[in-house]
A protein has these predicted regions:
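N-terminal Rossmann-like NAD(P) cofactor-binding subdomain of oxidoreductases
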Residues: 2-146, 151-152
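Active-site-lining helix/loop region of Rossmann-like oxidoreductase modules
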Residues: 6, 10, 14, 130-250, ...
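C-terminal helix-rich "cap/oligomerization" subdomain common to oxidoreductases
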Residues: 283-293
Length: 293
């Protein structure tokens, strides 16, 4: 059996619990501590049934026992991560930030995975960022002159937990920052709609760019290419509207369905960021395990 890198998860809500279940399938990762604030939470009960070590002392558990883990997923909130980040940095941990705190290197695995894992703190941006930024990146590979990009993500209200709702402002800021960085556009706008429809809808994200005379054929090639790369770690990622041009605007729409691990399949918004985070952790683990052979 291959040696695995030990993972600590701070935050035992939807994101943290789904990460825990995904880690159980990994050839390169094992969860050594699942820590939050409430031992009676649903996530804690699931972790206990798996025999995972639990704690209700949050980050203090890792501070008191630094050798517990090599990688830390912070699945708390942007505000909490602002205080967690310097502590974990002093402990020398490789940190994957699931919040929109935007302290570390912004990462979309299909775009900058190798570069991101050179950092000690990797920020997974937002669910809308993971869905839209690769499309924006593909479009501006063909048309780097684009100056304005906009993205609108619509998710089921049932998939928006307390952390998502608390972090809405940070979500907008971080998604817009990621769009500007990866596309090169001077201006970016991000919007998030919560849809209460029943049955619940899958996540859907539309990317719009202002452009004159687009090369639709080449844009379509680049968009389909990057979608295939994303599907390697997010199987439910699909282009539902190929590049379309109307009234000086280029549009592409994607839909994301989750794997249905801890979260329902319609919660593709949570699944895409978790799948991306696992991809980062496994890439880091493979590099370190090879180095230590």
């Amino acid at each position: 059996m291959n040696k695995k890198l030990r993972v600590g998860i701070i935050g035992t809500g939807n994101i943290g619990t789904d990460l825990l279940i995904k880690i159980q399938r990994s050839q390169y990762l094992e969860c050594s501590i699942f820590t939050g604030r409430n031992l009676a939470s649903p996530g804690m009960r699931i972790a206990a049934s798996m025999g995972i070590r639990l704690s209700d002392e949050g980050i203090d558990t890792i501070v008191n026992e630094p050798n517990l883990c090599d990688i830390v997923f912070d699945a708390t909130s942007a505000k909490s991560h602002l205080s967690h980040a310097p502590i974990l940095d002093r402990l020398g941990k490789f940190v994957i930030d699931m919040t929109p705190a935007k302290i570390g290197t912004l990462c979309v695995p299909a775009v900058n995975l190798d570069e991101a894992v050179k950092s000690r703190n990797v920020n997974m941006i937002t669910c809308g960022g993971q869905a839209s930024i690769p499309i924006a990146y593909a479009i501006t590979k063909v048309h780097p002159e684009i100056e304005y990009i906009e993205t609108v993500s619509t998710i089921s209200s049932r998939s928006a937990g307390p952390a998502t709702r608390i972090n809405i402002d940070e979500y907008i800021e971080t998604t817009e920052k990621g769009l500007r960085i990866f596309s090169g556009a001077k201006e970016a706008k991000a919007m998030l709609n919560l849809n209460p429809a029943k049955p619940a809808i899958d996540m859907q994200t539309t990317v719009m760019a202002e452009i004159e005379s687009p090369n639709l054929k080449q844009i379509t090639i680049e968009v389909e290419k990057i979608a295939q790369q994303i599907q390697r770690y997010v199987p439910g990622y699909r282009i539902v509207v190929l590049p379309t041009y109307d009234n000086h605007r280029l549009l592409v729409t994607v839909r994301v369905q989750g794997l249905g691990d801890y979260l329902p399949k319609f919660a593709g918004n949570l699944d895409i960021i978790n799948c991306a985070a696992i991809e980062v952790a496994e890439h880091f683990a493979k590099k370190n395990l090879m180095r230590n052979k």
